[in-house]
Amino acid sequence: AIELMKKFLDAATVDFKANGNAEFYLKYMSVPKEEEIFQTLLLMKEAKFHIEITDLIIPKIGDNLEDARKLVRWIVENLGENTPIHFLRFFPHYLLRNLPPTPIETLEEHAKIAKEEGLKFVYIGNVPGHELENTYCPSCGKVVVRRYGIETLEINIDEQGRCKYCKAKLPFVMEISK
């Protein structure tokens, strides 16, 4: 399947829930072997896809910090430190209406772990206006892409893909239109 996808896709976002916890996947999603997701990610990397990870953090049943650390370590070791990860806020819906929205502090704890483990591009999603919606230069720490929700407000990357402030080369594949 990856070979077929290569003809049409350059990038993929792989969506985890509950930090990829095996028990969660079986109980809530009827996925018997979550390791197949990890194997697919390795095949995507081998096929040179740009990969981003999203992780829906669900309070009380899918927000374990040790599971987060385990997932992030796997990403760093297997996909690399430049792999973006987006920790997404959960909102009650459908069969999980009994749960509260994910506390922002919980998302921030997940982001802190991802940074501690070495990921350079860590985001928080579904929280418009949060500072971790933005992309920061790993060299100088300044905002290179400022966002609000899905809107891009400012890009501080030059035509050569470098930070406009410190000129560090950024690992992005993009075209900047004027």
Model-predicted regions and their roles:
Residues 1-102:
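Conserved AdoMet/S-adenosylmethionine-binding subsite of the radical SAM
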Residues 60-178:
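Auxiliary Fe-S-binding modules of radical SAM enzymes
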